[in-house]
């Protein structure tokens, strides 16, 4: 445990005492919102961002420890686990360092080096590496085989691999060129600006790299990773491998083998590592932006206590209109055709005016999709009773909600167009309560959201929703099961039980009444009670 605490503390730059407390609480089943709000005395007042960082780092560290145990076992089984190697494996702080140490003992496919070993050329390779041979008295095939073996040894040397990694990090470039036979298409594609693109890896912006990767995946571009002074790097690699006082014949063969190792084995491998690291870094930046965008949408100020006229605009199929009350309940629905092709502005104005008067509606929520601007101009000139203020509302994901099981359960007798318009109106009344019903990825939170690691994106967005819900808290007597499911310690099953109990027994009079809900144990109650409001 101490080893894990120290590793997490190093990764997060947080005090070991606080990190240890957070890990203990997480292992006891506590959630990030609960720890950051109600266990400050144990964590040294770490905030939610810090606690979340510990949770994320802990997962990575435990994965590394699991891999470390596997590597130790595999190397021991191979009979190669010396005390020195064991110490180096136990000290490896990153997965890259660990895999470098494991590389010589990892099961391999058939390679040039393995073929050379089968032919008995390894003793010659060892003599060349010793550097004492004044002349190489062996056949050309034997020398080539020995050099293949030496090249493999060089490629499995952590020091050489790290030299190449540092060179890519310091002097590496990513270059883009048009894919074969796609030059003309590239000129009219969204990626035209990236033709001939060349940028230092350390200066390549996350959105640029994601765009390059997308263009490569779609067949428009070919990407290449280069190092500015490759000959100097190869010379440094040769100088770092083999005995310093090797004879000239041995030195020439060792240098040739190292050069071959760099071009054939090390560089392609490190290129892949570099591309993966760049992608991971770009994903991290993009996912952070997407999470921030989602947080802003979820925490937009609610317009509670207002009765809303909501419109989902459209051209040919008309503008779907609903009236919803202060709680978001559907009062009435209609369809109007105020814009092209019908332009029935008079009929549309009469229908809206009637709905406003009959249901005492005082604000308008207008979806920002197709025909939104044209419909907004119509509303401005319609002369509606009371001149209600018009709010333009994002309708991203409304169509997803309208076809969901949740929407069908709420409005089994209404079609998807009515359900979508209701969602737009509810987003104005209480954005958080409505948007949690939709998969966060369907809300449309960023330009490259489909290019990043989808598992990481889903995890980050789900956490953002949970964080927002718990930062605001919910009214246990009005919250939907979907909203309750994000509360600390509850989850989908218990949320359904709460709603069912509330439906059968009436509103909760106090938090303690929650203990009567089936499956609401002491731990769940402890973790959730502070985030639930009972008016």
Question: Model-found features: residue ranges?
Answer:
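A short acidic Gly-Thr/Ser loop motif
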Residues: 29, 313-317, 519
């Amino acid at each position: 445990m101490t080893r894990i605490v120290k590793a997490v503390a190093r990764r997060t730059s947080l005090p070991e005492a606080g990190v240890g407390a957070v890990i203990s609480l997480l292992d006891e089943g506590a959630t990030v919102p609960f720890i950051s709000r109600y266990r400050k005395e144990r964590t040294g007042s770490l905030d939610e961002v810090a606690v979340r960082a510990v949770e994320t780092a802990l997962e990575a560290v435990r994965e590394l420890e699991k891999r470390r145990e596997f590597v130790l076992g595999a190397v021991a089984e191979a009979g190669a686990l010396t005390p020195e190697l064991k110490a180096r494996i136990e000290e490896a702080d990153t997965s890259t360092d660990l895999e470098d140490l494991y590389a010589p003992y990892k099961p391999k496919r058939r390679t040039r080096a393995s073929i050379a070993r089968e032919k008995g050329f390894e003793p010659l390779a060892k003599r060349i590496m010793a550097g004492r041979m004044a002349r190489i008295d062996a056949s050309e095939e034997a020398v080539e085989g020995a050099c293949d073996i030496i090249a493999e040894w060089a490629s499995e040397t952590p020091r050489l691999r790290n030299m190449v990694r540092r060179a890519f990090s310091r002097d590496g470039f990513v270059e883009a060129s048009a894919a074969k036979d796609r030059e003309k298409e590239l000129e009219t594609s969204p990626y035209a600006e990236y033709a001939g693109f060349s940028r230092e890896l350390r200066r390549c912006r996350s959105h640029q790299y994601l765009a390059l990767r997308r263009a490569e995946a779609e067949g428009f571009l070919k990407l290449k990773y280069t190092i500015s002074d490759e000959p100097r790097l190869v010379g440094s690699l040769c100088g770092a491998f083999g005995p310093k006082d090797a004879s000239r014949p041995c030195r020439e063969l060792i240098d040739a083998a190292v050069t071959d190792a760099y071009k054939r084995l090390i560089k392609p491998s490190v290129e892949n590592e570099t591309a993966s690291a760049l992608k991971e870094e770009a994903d991290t930046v993009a996912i952070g932006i997407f999470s921030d965008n989602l947080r802003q949408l979820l925490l937009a100020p609610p317009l509670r206590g207002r009765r809303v006229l909501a419109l989902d605009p459209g051209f040919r199929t008309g503008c779907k209109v609903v009236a919803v009350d202060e709680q978001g309940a559907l009062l009435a629905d209609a369809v109007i055709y105020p814009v092209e092709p019908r332009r029935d502005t008079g009929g549309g104005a009469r229908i809206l005016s009637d709905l406003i008067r009959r249901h005492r509606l005082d604000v308008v929520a207008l979806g920002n999709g197709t025909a939104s601007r044209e419909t907004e101009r119509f509303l401005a000139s319609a002369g509606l009773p009371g001149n209600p203020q018009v709010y333009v509302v994002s309708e991203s994901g409304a169509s997803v909600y309208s076809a969901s099981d949740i929407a069908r359960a709420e409005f089994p007798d209404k079609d998807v167009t009515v359900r979508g318009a209701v969602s737009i109106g509810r987003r104005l009344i209480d954005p958080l309560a409505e948007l949690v019903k939709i998969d966060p990825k369907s809300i449309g939170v960023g330009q490259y959201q489909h290019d990043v690691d989808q598992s990481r994106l889903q995890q980050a967005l789900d956490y953002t929703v949970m964080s927002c819900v718990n930062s605001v808290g919910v009214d246990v007597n009005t919250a939907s099961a979907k909203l309750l499911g994000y509360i600390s310690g509850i989850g989908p099953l218990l949320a359904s039980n709460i709603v069912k109990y509330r439906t059968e027994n009436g509103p909760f009079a106090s938090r303690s009444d929650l203990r009567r809900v089936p499956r609401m144990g002491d731990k769940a109650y402890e973790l959730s009670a502070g985030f639930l409001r009972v008016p």
